[in-house]
């Protein structure tokens, strides 16, 4: 009789054989990704090479510590992997030092806070209602609980960052750390001006480039490398890698602090299979094809924004410099939640999003956030995004007219045709 361990480790035994419930859930998710248009700005389609690395035997290896200084034996090959990830990341962003161990962008930010701040210190970040991220000092987040959080905003008229307000708040509150970054800001950031303001109050400047990393690597968005004391990012989104985080800098002293903050400060053993997948993604991003891809990502976002505006929809800031397009639904008297639910039923996934100075609850919102990275990976071009804008408008008009169930059914068939023309995996 075969014992359990023999059955589990028999190479002939697949996931389907061992755990059909999980297998079927994964298969259903694959079919969802294949049959829907993924317009969530923080999502992308990782390559098979990235996923192969993440599903590798490195899953089995515990490697607490850093290269050459592990607390476990048998780490010579995972050292090779981590070293490649670091070298490639530094080359990608033209920096000297990198930590590739953070499990997420949020933990990368926490590592910076642990490196530079003590509880009660003042930080200055973009308000979440104006496009900032939870970890930039939002009240429900630890960054808003541990530190005195001052939030800057955007200009009410243009919806662009109000750098004069950033400077005024910095001079008034003397923050120890200024954060330049966002999760829902479609335009370019003036990292040079941020650094000038930071220098005036002797503050550190953290650039959180989680959304813009791929664009920066490809030269389609300004790089903070010359200006920020320290930079954090995720490795998925526009970098098209596994879900994870990184911290990079040109300052050796800050790098050493980050090393200690990540381990042993915040984490134990790194996820070596994920670090391997990060390394693969960095290699992909260093290839000329990646620059061409990112160029199309930005072009497609501009086309999407323009097409939505032609339908009479209000696009925040009037356009985009990135992969992000934000739509304000207040003129249509619709909520983000109502619209996103209808769009999903029609086969288009995006996310509800607060718009500047939104009075709706975060669970409802008055806007939508779209991103073009995933569907550009799929192969969609400008003309396809014009059609997608038409489909989005059809759904929104259906909501306004109260016949959205009929519209959703029609749009879903059109979405299926696009997806069939551009298959994934």
UniProtKB/Swiss-Prot annotation:
Transcription regulation listed as a keyword: no
Reaction equation(s) it catalyzes: (6R)-5,10-methylene-5,6,7,8-tetrahydrofolate + glycine + H2O = (6S)-5,6,7,8-tetrahydrofolate + L-serine
Record's GO cellular component terms: cytosol
Keyword set includes Cytoplasm: yes
Organism the protein comes from: Wolbachia sp. subsp. Brugia malayi (strain TRS)
One Pfam family matching this protein: SHMT
Family: Belongs to the SHMT family.
Recorded metabolic or biological pathway in which this protein acts: One-carbon metabolism; tetrahydrofolate interconversion; Amino-acid biosynthesis; glycine biosynthesis; glycine from L-serine: step 1/1
Enzyme Commission number(s) of this protein: 2.1.2.1
A molecular function GO annotation: pyridoxal phosphate binding
Alphabetical keyword list: Amino-acid biosynthesis, Cytoplasm, One-carbon metabolism, Pyridoxal phosphate, Transferase
Record protein name field: Serine hydroxymethyltransferase
Role according to the record: Catalyzes the reversible interconversion of serine and glycine with tetrahydrofolate (THF) serving as the one-carbon carrier. This reaction serves as the major source of one-carbon groups required for the biosynthesis of purines, thymidylate, methionine, and other important biomolecules. Also exhibits THF-independent aldolase activity toward beta-hydroxyamino acids, producing glycine and aldehydes, via a retro-aldol mechanism.
Alphabetical list of InterPro entries matching this protein: PyrdxlP-dep_Trfase (IPR015424), PyrdxlP-dep_Trfase_major (IPR015421), PyrdxlP-dep_Trfase_small (IPR015422), Ser_HO-MeTrfase (IPR001085), Ser_HO-MeTrfase-like (IPR049943), Ser_HO-MeTrfase_PLP_BS (IPR019798), SHMT-like_dom (IPR039429)
Protein residues bound to (6S)-5,6,7,8-tetrahydrofolate: 132-134
Principal EC category: transferase
Cofactor(s) required for function per UniProt: pyridoxal 5'-phosphate
CDD domains assigned to the protein according to its UniProt record, in alphabetical order: SHMT (cd00378)
Domain of life (superkingdom): Bacteria
């Amino acid at each position: 009789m075969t014992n359990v361990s023999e059955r589990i480790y028999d190479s002939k035994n697949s996931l389907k054989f061992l755990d059909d419930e999980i297998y079927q859930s994964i298969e259903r998710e694959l079919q969802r990704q294949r049959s829907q248009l993924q317009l969530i700005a923080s999502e992308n389609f990782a390559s098979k090479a990235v996923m192969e690395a993440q599903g590798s035997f490195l899953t089995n290896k515990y490697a607490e510590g850093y290269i050459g200084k592990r607390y476990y034996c048998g780490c010579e090959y995972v050292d090779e992997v981590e070293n490649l990830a670091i070298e490639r990341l530094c080359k990608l962003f033209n920096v000297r030092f990198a930590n590739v161990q953070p499990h997420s962008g949020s933990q990368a930010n926490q590592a910076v806070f642990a490196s530079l701040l003590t509880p009660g210190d003042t930080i200055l970040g973009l308000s979440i209602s104006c496009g900032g991220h939870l970890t930039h000092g939002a009240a429900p987040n630890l960054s808003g609980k541990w530190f005195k959080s001052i939030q800057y905003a955007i200009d009410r008229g243009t919806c662009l960052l109000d750098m004069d307000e950033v400077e005024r708040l910095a001079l008034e509150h003397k923050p120890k750390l200024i954060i330049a970054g966002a999760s829902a800001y479609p335009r370019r950031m003036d990292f040079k001006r941020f650094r000038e303001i930071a220098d005036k109050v002797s503050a550190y400047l953290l650039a959180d480039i989680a959304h813009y990393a791929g664009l920066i690597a490809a030269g389609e968005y300004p790089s903070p490398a010359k200006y920020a004391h320290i930079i954090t990012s995720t490795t998925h989104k526009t970098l098209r890698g596994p879900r994870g985080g990184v911290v990079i800098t040109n300052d050796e002293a800050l790098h050493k602090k980050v090393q200690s903050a990540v381990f042993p400060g915040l984490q134990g053993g790194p996820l070596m299979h994920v670090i391997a997948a990060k390394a693969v993604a960095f290699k992909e991003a260093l290839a000329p094809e990646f620059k061409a891809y990112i160029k199309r990502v930005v072009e497609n976002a501009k086309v999407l924004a323009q097409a939505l505006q032609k339908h009479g929809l209000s696009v925040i800031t009037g356009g985009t410099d990135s992969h992000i397009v934000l739509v304000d639904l207040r003129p249509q008297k619709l909520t983000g939640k109502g619209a996103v639910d209808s769009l999903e039923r029609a086969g288009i996934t995006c996310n509800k999003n607060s718009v500047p100075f939104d009075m709706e609850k975060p669970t409802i919102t008055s806007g939508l956030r779209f991103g073009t990275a995933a569907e550009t990976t799929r192969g969609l071009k400008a003309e396809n995004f014009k059609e997608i804008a038409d489909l989005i408008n059809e759904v929104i008009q259906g909501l306004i007219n109260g016949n959205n169930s009929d519209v959703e059914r029609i749009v879903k068939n059109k979405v299926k045709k696009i997806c069939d023309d551009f298959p994934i995996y």
